[in-house]
């Protein structure tokens, strides 16, 4: 009988097996390519790919030193109090928890691509690398990843405890960081609060997202005050954080009664910073940063109209002319919005993405431009839904939405425009097209998309004559169309 000799087995004609591979490759006794967070062999079953033992071994080996005879090994009381604290703050220890490797892999490959589908690669890479050195940020990312995964598989209750565990750890770590003056002025601290805020928005936690957003405002203000005394411009990662905050704050201010944390929409001169792609469509926001102060002003004027006309109690289409001041403001806003309509993605954006995706980014920008005009006409000038200027903006929004592929990543950027168009149309074909596109967007696993679609259907079914923002305010429903 011709049996196989171990010496002739090709599987044995290889270098000795490394001991720093993932747990699954070591168990199967196969070579691991050491890719993080999931190696190539485990890509189909990422939950089984763990590097926890290698983390411990490497750290233990690095810290090990030769004992010196005659000298005590016990540290002083002061040192003893530090050692367990440092060990507990090791972020890599988080990845030894069940499912943490899978959740980190899911965040890198899925969650961040849904939140910021066109962001420059350096943003995601830096975010994850920073989290590996910052426990509270890592916990926040794991909580966001778990929330997103739970919505994708439509089993939120099954993962609720895991989300809560990582959220509580992130909040505890954030509080500890805020108590330390040296930690408060680190971008990582503001980033943790921003991740928690965004996850609250996606989960519909109306009370806590405002608390976190207000905290981010204070942290960023302090950080930028320090930057003014330092040489050079903010790094790209920090600018992405600024734009992330600005995009959420702007849309929160336009979605309901939230006044915005930065009322004038200037966002620390983001719109005049050459490093923010001034004159181009921004990859984080999906529109030009020059539109930010104009959107903020529209939100201000809209809220002032609601207050002055007391339309929370009774609302009818306006029969009196606008004040001279408001008319002038509206005309100025219209001119300034139209002046930036033709902005296109930057050369850097074109280098990172294919031509189709870059073209869709221009469509997202135009969708925001026409949505801004729609809100200006309806909520500031108080034009009726049937007015030609209003109808023209609804048509233009839907034209640019249709120019974006149904399942393109760019759909993640257009929740506010498509919701705005849906609230201002009575045309059945337009409503059907909007519902179909929003159903596609809902499959991305962001909870605010689901709530927006449900709210729009509720508004349509009500047949209410009042404007959408008035209707939702009276109903006690608050949305953040981010």
PLM features: what roles do these ranges have?
Residues 196-200:
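Acidic, glycine-rich active-site loops and adjacent beta-strand->loop/helix elements
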């Amino acid at each position: 009988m011709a049996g196989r000799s171990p010496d002739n087995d090709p599987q044995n004609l290889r270098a000795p097996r490394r001991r720093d591979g993932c747990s699954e490759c070591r168990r199967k006794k196969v070579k691991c390519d050491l890719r993080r967070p999931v190696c190539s062999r485990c890509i189909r079953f990422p939950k089984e790919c763990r590097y926890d033992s290698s983390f411990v071994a490497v750290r233990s080996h690095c810290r090990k030193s030769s004992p010196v005879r005659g000298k005590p090994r016990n540290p002083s009381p002061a040192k003893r109090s530090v050692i367990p604290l440092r060990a507990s703050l090791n972020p890599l220890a988080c990845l030894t928890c069940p499912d943490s490797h899978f959740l980190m892999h899911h965040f890198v490959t899925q969650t961040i691509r849904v939140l910021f589908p066109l962001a420059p690669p350096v943003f995601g890479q830096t975010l994850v690398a920073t989290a590996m050195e910052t426990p509270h940020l890592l916990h926040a990312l794991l909580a966001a990843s778990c929330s997103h995964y739970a919505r994708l598989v439509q089993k939120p209750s099954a993962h609720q405890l895991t989300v809560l565990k990582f959220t509580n750890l992130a909040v505890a770590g954030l509080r500890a960081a805020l108590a330390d003056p040296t930690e408060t002025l680190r971008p990582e601290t503001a980033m943790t609060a921003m991740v928690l805020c965004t996850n609250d928005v996606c989960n519909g936690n109306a009370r806590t997202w405002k608390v976190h957003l207000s905290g981010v405002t204070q942290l960023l203000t302090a950080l930028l005050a320090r930057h003014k005394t330092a040489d050079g411009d903010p790094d790209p990662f920090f600018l992405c954080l600024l734009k992330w905050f600005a995009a959420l704050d702007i849309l929160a201010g336009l979605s309901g009664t939230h006044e915005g944390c930065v009322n004038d929409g200037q966002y620390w001169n983001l719109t005049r910073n050459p490093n923010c792609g001034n004159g181009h469509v921004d990859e984080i926001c999906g529109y030009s940063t020059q539109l930010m102060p104009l959107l903020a002003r529209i939100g201000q004027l809209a809220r002032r109209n609601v207050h002055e006309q007391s339309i929370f109690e009774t609302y009818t289409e306006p029969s009196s002319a606008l004040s001279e001041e408001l008319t002038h403001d509206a005309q100025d806003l219209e001119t300034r919005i139209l002046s930036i309509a033709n902005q296109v993605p930057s050369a850097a954006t074109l280098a990172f993405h294919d031509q189709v995706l870059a073209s869709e980014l221009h469509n997202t920008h135009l969708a925001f431009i026409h949505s801004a005009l729609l809100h200006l006409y309806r909520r500031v000038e108080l034009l009726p839904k049937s007015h030609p200027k209003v109808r023209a903006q609804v048509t233009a929004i839907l034209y640019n939405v249709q120019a974006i592929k149904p399942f393109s990543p760019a759909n993640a950027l257009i929740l506010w425009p498509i919701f705005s168009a849906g609230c201002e149309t009575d045309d059945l074909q337009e409503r059907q097209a909007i519902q179909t596109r929003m159903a596609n967007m809902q499959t991305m696993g962001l909870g605010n998309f689901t709530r927006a679609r449900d709210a729009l259907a509720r508004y349509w079914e009500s047949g209410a004559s009042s404007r959408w923002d008035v209707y939702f305010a009276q109903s006690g429903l608050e949305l953040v169309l981010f």
